[in-house]
Curated annotation (Swiss-Prot):
Domain of life, per lineage: Bacteria
PANTHER family cross-referenced by the UniProt entry: POLYNUCLEOTIDYL TRANSFERASE, RIBONUCLEASE H-LIKE SUPERFAMILY PROTEIN, RIBONUCLEASE HI
Name of the coding gene: ypeP
Alphabetical list of CDD domains matching this protein: RNase_HI_like
Entry coiled-coil feature ranges: none
Record-given protein name: Uncharacterized protein YpeP
Residues in RNase H type-1 domain copies: 71-207
Organism of derivation: Bacillus subtilis (strain 168)
MF term (GO), any: RNA-DNA hybrid ribonuclease activity
A Pfam family hit: RVT_3
Length: 226
């Protein structure tokens, strides 16, 4: 979950002044920020706004942070789909990075389905990726979704209209799943060269190479095999 502070300061002879920050903080950062500001006598009011416009007091934020400490945070999803026209077999590549208990983790997985087009494969890859996020236990949080499919990401964020009935079905399924988990998505279109990890997984399963790994990462983002 991302939050930004709204605060009111009152000093002698000047009355109160309200401030609003445009910078987003994680729940943990917001709690630390609130504790530090709470030490100053001129602080009159402090609340935090979440990405959906909700307000949180420090007391509510303390409780939320304790609850979220047991759930994945700082979640980034990479997805990609490959499609073989002759067999109508779609390969789905999924990579999820997240934090839990102060440690970074990475989930890598591929799946295959019978579909009709490459765009459907891209939609299916993202849908299955969000299902994996659900299995990790994530909810009420922010999620960054990255892929190289302009069709999927631009239709999801509303930049492009969607006229294809099958695409609309996938859009509805993805949005319903995100809503049920209370996840707030940010969509980022990336270059294909920056999506090689998910792309490689999607292609491997078309060659019957199944991959499923769940790895703890070290501080440099590398596999922690020690």
């Amino acid at each position: 979950m991302k939050l930004r502070p709204h605060l009111k300061i009152e000093a002698k002879g000047t009355g109160s002044v309200s401030f609003f920050s445009e910078d987003w903080l994680t729940a943990q950062q917001a709690r630390t920020f609130a504790r530090e500001l709470g030490r100053f006598p001129y602080m009159k009011e402090l609340e935090f706004e979440d990405e959906k416009g909700g307000s949180w007091t420090l007391k509510e934020l303390e409780k939320l942070t304790e609850e979220l400490a047991q759930e994945p945070d700082d979640i980034t999803v990479y997805f990609d789909g490959s499609f073989d026209k002759e067999s109508e077999l779609a390969g789905l590549g999924i990579v999820i990075y997240y934090s839990l208990g102060g440690t970074r983790h990475r989930l890598r997985k591929n799946k295959s389905f019978r579909l009709k087009t490459n765009n459907e494969a891209e939609y299916a890859a993202l849908y299955e990726a969000i299902r994996e996020v659900r299995e990790l236990g994530a909810s009420r949080n922010s999620i960054t979704i990255k892929g190289d499919s302009l069709v999927v990401l631009n239709q999801l964020d509303g930049s492009w209209p969607c006229y294809d009935p099958s695409h609309n079905e996938w859009l509805d399924k993805i949005e319903a799943l995100l809503e049920s988990l209370k996840l707030t998505p940010t969509y980022e279109t990336i270059q294909r060269k920056d999506n090689q990890e998910a792309d490689g997984l999607a292609k491997k399963i078309l060659s019957h190479q199944f991959v499923e790994s769940h790895t703890k990462l070290d501080r440099n983002g590398d596999d922690d095999i020690g």
